Amino acid sequence: MAKEKISEQELITRIRGEITGALGYMGDTISQQREQAMQYYYGLPFGNEVEGRSQYVDTTVQDTIEWIKPSLMRVFASGDEMVKFTPHGPEDVQMAEQATDYVNYVFTKDNPGWEILYSWFTDALLSKNGIVKVWWDEYENEEREEYRNLDENGLMVLISDDEVEVVEHTQHQQEGEPPYHDIVIKRKSYDGRIKIENVPPSEFLIARESKNIQEARFVCHRVLKTLSELKEMYPDEDLDPAELGGGDEDLMAFSGERLERYAYDKSAQYWEGWGDTDVEEEGLRTYWLHESFLKTDWDGDGITELRKVCTVGSKVLSNEEIDKIPFVSLTPVKIPHKFYGLSVADLVMDLQLIKSTLMRNLMDNMYNQNFGRYAVLEGQANLDDLLTQRPGGVVRVKSPNAVTPLATPALEPYTFQMLEYIDSVRESRAGVSRMSQGLNENALTSHTTATAVNAVMGAAQSRVELIARNFAETGVKDLMICIYELLYKNQDRERVVKLRNQWIPVRPDVWKDKYDCSVSVALGSGNKDQQMAHLSQMLSFAGDAMKGGLPIVNIQNMYNLGAALVRAMGFQNVDDFLTNPATIPPKQEGPSPKEQMEQAELQLKEKELEIKAADVQVKMQKIQQEYQKDAVDAQLKAAELNLESQQNRPVAIG
């Protein structure tokens, strides 16, 4: 028996149930942990402060995260290639190079790549997982155009375009002449681009048993939109504010995690309820839009398909089948078989509490040493004098031993040792040491070698490098593949962009499928100075090899080394300094000695033939001259004979 199609009300009920049961929903454990991490990041009070005592708050979480971020940004954003597609065969080389250049161009030029990476990494280091959303955004452009003195044919050609809308039209005609037209039009054009945006952790929901986004049963992005924005997004829908309500009947709009982001400077409302009901303009009232991506048997064929359902309150704005969930996640400490991992804040939050407690006790101890307590014999001292603390003050007593200071043990040496130990624990957990921060003045001495410093730095940074590799393999790589797929499926028009200092026409729809290429993220070791030193050594070795005639290096290898060195120096336009030998047209090589000899012999034979031909021509001319002479002689002889017969006497002519 065939199943019936799911009704819209059943779908809304399913979505509500998925939302309330999802991770990150309204104050669950994940949300509370992220809220606490934000409090620790800002260095806000713990809530256990005592009036009159020290209320110092350490910032270990903030310091650790802010020291890790420069290393991550240097790894991913310092080069000219965020991703590289490697061809599987010689026929894929040109396509892979163009895909590499264009995908990097889309990420860094069409989108704010640096800002996306910075916010993405910050969310992951602070809130367990960083989320970005990537999709193909189609948009419509309108351009105003004016034309004057058009004839009838020109007017018909112009307005016959379906994308043209006539705004103004004036017809002019003089007696005895055809009419002409002045016209103002709006020309519509449609295009699309890849869009990438960071998703706040508080706006992202995922089914509890999920291991990753693409295999999740349910994923939701809840975002605050004004009524005006909703009407622009869904122009065909009748959006009645009374029907929409507040866009949230179950208080899910309230999020302590989201509000904690603004707790440091109090820059947001403390209570976010059912939209901004105090806003007078109807178009500016806000509603919660839920973009739900769920697997459901919508058509009743017994097989679930992935659908995107957009809802505001109980109203469905769109319901369409899709092929992929448009989110990419990364986490610094991945836990196998789980979606959410651990953040750096999770690793060091307890250390911040311990250091804050130690520092509070130390400061209270110092206060007690400076303003200690006293044992006073009753009736033997003036208590008003004793309670008045001022320099040079006098305390009146009746006996020498009337006032005795109570001893306060000093905590300084023990506390500082404990703080050093806590810092070493942080180093082992997060990979951030005083040496890597540049704060240890005893790290470099006259006896410290560069190898020793590099060994210590490398050991301390291995944890950070592991985080970087985790980001590369679980997030950045997936993002670049998503960009490739979206370009391949949606961009069917040629676009001319500047790649490698040349204007190149790009048509991603003619590329091969992504599985013809592998993706590698540019995760290197060492800083720019080390890379330059290594490249210089390789360049010197390659030069010596070429001088020695070793066949292991050619001119193209030398160019590649030089180009890498130029890029490591910070210059991206390699062509300004070096010329790629592959672009130089080949020189016309001269003939070989054998060919030269054969050519000389051929020329000699040609000369001999020319001489023989000249001799033949001379002989022919001589024969012709003799023939002509004989003919003249014969004519003269005939004339003489004729005269002799007439005159009956001998005659000589000539």
Please place each PLM-identified region on the residue numbering.
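Broad, structure-driven detector of short, well-ordered beta-strand segments within folded domains
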Residues: 285-293
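Calcium-binding acidic motifs and repeat modules
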Residues: 306-311
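Acidic, glycine-anchored loop motifs typical of Ca2+
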Residues: 277-279, 283-285, 297-304
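Low-complexity, glycine- and small/polar-enriched segments
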Residues: 185-190, 196, 204, 210, ...
